Amino acid sequence: ALQAGDRLPLAEAARPWLRRAPDWSLAPWPWFDVSPTRVLRLLRGSHFDALDAASRTALLGEPFLIASESNRVGVRLLGPALQLSAPLELVSAAVTPGTVQLPPGGQPIMLAAEHPTTGGYPRIAHLIATDQPQLAQRRPGETVRLALVEPDEAEALRRRQAAALARLHDYVKQRRRELGCDA
């Protein structure tokens, strides 16, 4: 049986660059935050102002639990029941990942990667693109809080994320070149 301090011999590395690979790591990414309650940022949806005042306050001030019925189509949020000021008669309209719909029960649904192409519920908000990976990492039973941002802030966050990913790509490409693994 293996014991603490045992050393295991390894066969010659199949790829010579593996022997030369230095230890390195990346800092945790802010969009994969693992804090117990993550704040997800939203843009106002076309029907945000149709929410009554108490519902707008609750949407942005109360925590929401990710429901066990969540999947890759939509993430169901459980929290205070949200209500419209008056009923809306809507025709189906295009939706995208991150669209926050409000079905009749008052519990919002954030559309995810395998969302339908159209939806007929009020579109009260839209999760910004930068926070969509964070939503995808949340599990049923975890909580999220929601906050509104302006479009210019959402765009600045998207640009910052894109720049960070470009730097990572360049760094990995350079390291692979240095290690001779692109040959």
What are these regions (language model features)?
Residues 1-183:
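Conserved "landmark" site that anchors the functional core of diverse proteins
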